[in-house]
Swiss-Prot record:
Keywords: ATP-binding, Kinase, Magnesium, Nucleotide-binding, Transferase. Pyridoxal kinase involved in the salvage pathway of pyridoxal 5'-phosphate (PLP). Catalyzes the phosphorylation of pyridoxal to PLP. Gene3D superfamilies: 3.40.1190.20. Substrate binds at S9, M44, Q45, D221. This is Pyridoxal kinase PdxY. It comes from the Bacteria. Its cofactor is Mg(2+). InterPro entries: PM/HMP-P_kinase-1, PyrdxlKinase, Pyridoxal_kinase_PdxY, Ribokinase-like. HAMAP family: PdxY. It comes from Burkholderia thailandensis (strain ATCC 700388 / DSM 13276 / CCUG 48851 / CIP 106301 / E264). GO terms for molecular function: ATP binding; magnesium ion binding; pyridoxal kinase activity.
Length: 287
C-alpha cells in the first residue's frame, strides 16, 4: 500500500486542509501521514475560531522522528497545502528534500495555497517563496485560476492561455499542472472547469456548478487529495483527472442536496471510491 505525507492545515470541526484530504485518500486505499501546519477549531469563515500554527522547526523534528524509526523510506509522495509562514514553507522544502533523499522514487505534489484558505491568509512572503522556489522542487502542482496567474506571471482568460501558462511552469520543473478551477470566458456560466496539463498533452473537464448560499470550504484540498491518491494507485494522468472530476462532483452534489455547509465526505464516501456519474475529459491545446 502506498504512503503519502500530507502537510496541510487541519480543523477539528468540519473539512478543510487535512480534514478534507486525509479520509478521501484513505478511502481510495492510500495510507496518509498527516502533518498539520495549523490546528484550528474550525475554518475561519464561521467568524469565530480558536487554534494556532505549529512551529516550523517542529515540522522538521516530526519528520526526523519518522526517519529515526526507519519508516521514512516507505514514504511514496509528499502533498503540501497551506503553509502559513515563510519559515513553514522553508521547512516543507527541507522535508521534501529529506523524503526524496531517503526514497529517490518519492514525488512531491504542491497545492500552492497563496490566497485565503478557509479564512486563513498566509503571512507576507509566503506567496513570493512559493512562486520563486516550489516549481523547481515539485513534480506536480495544483493551482486554482488565481494561483496559476501568479505562478506564470500572466493574466489568463481562455483555455489556450491557461495551457500556455501551465507549460511555462512545467519548463521550470513540474511534470504536470492540475488547475483545480479554471475561469474561461467562453464557458457556460453553470459549468465548473478543471484542466490538467503535461509537457505534451492537456485535458479539460467540466462538471455542474452548484449555487450554494455559502460555498463550502475545502473543495480544492479534496481535489488535490483525490488526484494524488489515484496517481499513487497507478492511474494515468487522464484517468486520475477524470476520477477526480467525478468524485469531487459527487461530494459537492451530496453537500448541496443535503443543504450543508461542510462537505459531506462520509456520506459520499462510496462515490469517492467509485463515482456513479462521470464527466469525460477531452484533449485541448495538445502539441
Amino acid at each position: 500500500m502506498k504512503n503519502v505525507l500530507s502537510i496541510q492545515s487541519h480543523v477539528i470541526y468540519g473539512h478543510a486542509g487535512n480534514s478534507a484530504a486525509v479520509f478521501p485518500m484513505q478511502r481510495l486505499g492510500v495510507n496518509v501521514w498527516p502533518l498539520n501546519t495549523v490546528q484550528l477549531s474550525n475554518h475561519m469563515q464561521y467568524g469565530h475560531w480558536a487554534g494556532s500554527a505549529i512551529d516550523a522547526a517542529k515540522m522538521e523534528q516530526l519528520v526526523d522522528g519518522i526517519a529515526a524509526i526507519g519508516a521514512l523510506k516507505r514514504c511514496d509522495a509528499v502533498l503540501s497545502g497551506f503553509l502559513g509562514s515563510p519559515a513553514q514553507a522553508r521547512a516543507a522544502v527541507e522535508i521534501v528534500r529529506t523524503v526524496k533523499a531517503t526514497n529517490p522514487n518519492a514525488w512531491y505534489f504542491c497545492d500552492p495555497a497563496m490566497g485565503q484558505t478557509g479564512g486563513i491568509r498566509p503571512e507576507p512572503g509566503v506567496e513570493e517563496f512559493i512562486v520563486a522556489e516550489l516549481p523547481e522542487l515539485a513534480d506536480g502542482m495544483a493551482p486554482n485560476h488565481g494561483e496559476l496567474q501568479k505562478l506564470a506571471g500572466q493574466r489568463i482568460e481562455t483555455v489556450a492561455e491557461a495551457v500556455e501558462a501551465c507549460r511555462s511552469i512545467i519548463r521550470r520543473g513540474p511534470r504536470l499542472i492540475l488547475v483545480k478551477h479554471l475561469h474561461d470566458r467562453n464557458s457556460p456560466a453553470d459549468r465548473f472547469n478543471m484542466l490538467v496539463v503535461t509537457e505534451t498533452e492537456a485535458w479539460i473537464g467540466q462538471r455542474p456548478l452548484y449555487a450554494f448560499p455559502r460555498h463550502p470550504v475545502g473543495v480544492g484540498d479534496l481535489t488535490s487529495a483525490i488526484f494524488v491518491a489515484r496517481r499513487l494507485r497507478g492511474d494515468s494522468v487522464r484517468a486520475a483527472f477524470e476520477h477526480t472530476l467525478a468524485a469531487v462532483h459527487a461530494v459537492v452534489k451530496a453537500t448541496y442536496d443535503a443543504r450543508r455547509y461542510e462537505l459531506e465526505l462520509v456520506a459520499a464516501q462510496d462515490e469517492i471510491a467509485q463515482p456513479s456519474e462521470w464527466f469525460g475529459a477531452w484533449v485541448t491545446g495538445a502539441d
